From Swiss-Prot:
Family: Belongs to the universal ribosomal protein uS17 family.
SUPFAM superfamilies found in the cross-reference section: Nucleic acid-binding proteins
Gene Ontology cellular-component annotations: cytosolic small ribosomal subunit
Official protein name in the record: Small ribosomal subunit protein uS17
Keywords assigned by UniProt, alphabetized: Ribonucleoprotein, Ribosomal protein, RNA-binding, rRNA-binding
Subunit relationships: Part of the 30S ribosomal subunit.
Lineage: Bacteria, Bacillati, Cyanobacteriota, Cyanophyceae, Synechococcales
InterPro entries noted in UniProt: NA-bd_OB-fold (IPR012340), Ribosomal_uS17 (IPR000266), Ribosomal_uS17_bact/chlr (IPR019984), Ribosomal_uS17_CS (IPR019979)
Highest taxon in the source lineage: Bacteria
Protein's organism: Prochlorococcus marinus (strain SARG / CCMP1375 / SS120)
């Protein structure tokens, strides 16, 4: 069985070794065909506390690590610092 992966943005890093990642899912409405966006928040394990708010990350499914934590940060795709430099 392949592990599920999601791409998202870190919205909270206030917990120790845990970040909250918001993943946006876009799909057409079943009747009106308008594109609808749904945001799901996942708690993900961050062993070294590397992630900061605003970072783009890839998370992968893992065994249950706590009551609500079933995802782990696989890699940081883009940091907040890199995004600020790209805008300039």
């Amino acid at each position: 069985m392949a592990l599920k992966e999601r791409l998202g943005t870190v919205v909270s890093d206030k917990m120790d070794k845990t970040v909250v990642v918001a993943v946006v899912n876009r799909f057409p409405h079943s009747i009106y065909q308008k594109t609808v966006s749904r945001t799901t928040r996942y708690k993900a394990h961050d062993e070294e506390n590397n992630c900061k708010v605003g970072d783009r990350v890839r998370i992968t499914e893992t065994r249950p690590l706590s009551a609500t934590k079933r995802w782990s940060v696989a890699e940081v795709l883009r940091t907040t610092k890199q995004e600020k430099e790209a805008v300039k």
